[in-house]
């Protein structure tokens, strides 16, 4: 059975994630507030950012940067 949540990104009810897609408290927040559709949009944006800014996901500073972008993208109204 699909989980229906109110997606804060889309501002409407939508199918929720099957599991937290990110570790920790942020992952739980995403699980509870971000739909599969919104997460897919973020993944596309993330790929663009990684490529355009030549980010290296093995580099801790670059991972922190992409996390910051993710928070802004998904929760920019908070």
Swiss-Prot record:
Name of the featured protein: Probable Fe(2+)-trafficking protein
Keyword Iron: yes
Role noted for this protein: Could be a mediator in iron transactions between iron acquisition and iron-requiring processes, such as synthesis and/or repair of Fe-S clusters in biosynthetic enzymes.
Subunit structure: Monomer.
InterPro entries listed in its UniProt record: Fe_traffick_prot_YggX, Fe_traffick_prot_YggX_sf
GO molecular function: iron ion binding
Membrane-spanning segments: none
Classification via SUPFAM superfamilies: YggX-like (SSF111148)
UniProt keyword annotation of Signal present: no
Family affiliation: Belongs to the Fe(2+)-trafficking protein family.
Keywords: Iron
GO BP annotations, alphabetical order: cellular response to oxidative stress
GO CC aspect terms: cytosol
Organism: Buchnera aphidicola subsp. Schizaphis graminum (strain Sg)
């Amino acid at each position: 059975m699909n989980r229906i949540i109110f997606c804060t990104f889309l501002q409407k009810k939508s199918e929720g994630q099957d599991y937290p897609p990110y570790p920790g408290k942020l992952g739980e927040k995403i699980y509870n507030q971000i739909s599969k559709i919104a997460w897919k949009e973020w993944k596309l944006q993330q790929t663009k950012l990684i490529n355009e800014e030549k980010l290296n996901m093995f580099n801790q500073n670059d991972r922190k940067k992409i996390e910051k972008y993710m928070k802004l993208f998904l929760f920019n109204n908070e």
